[in-house]
Amino acid sequence: MPDDSLHHYLSQQGAQFGGVAGEQVAQNYGDTNAEHRALTESVALVDLSFRGCLAVLGDDRVKFINGQVTNEVAGLKSGQGCYAALVNAKAKMQADLHVYRLDDELILDFEPGLLEAVTE
């Protein structure tokens, strides 16, 4: 990994790493109370690069995704998001995810290891 990577930066800040879905991610910095204060009273950087992410493009993206999930995506404005379950044709849950609406795309954000279930 290059010295300017996020991993290197977080290491310099005292991050203790662990494995998530085959990736090394910061799990803590050794002081839970200080971490909580930083998150609630200041600003914090949280590395979510290990999560699955999929961009949905095309003119029918909103209609298509709206028919695949349990929440109302069509009502979202650009910059808004919602939590939803992705279901199959028999309404069986395939994954839980967040859907974010941007001007020209929808972003699906889901737990690691679920890409196959989401793209099925």
Short names for language-model regions:
Residues 1-120:
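Basic, glycine/lysine-rich polyanion-binding surfaces/domains
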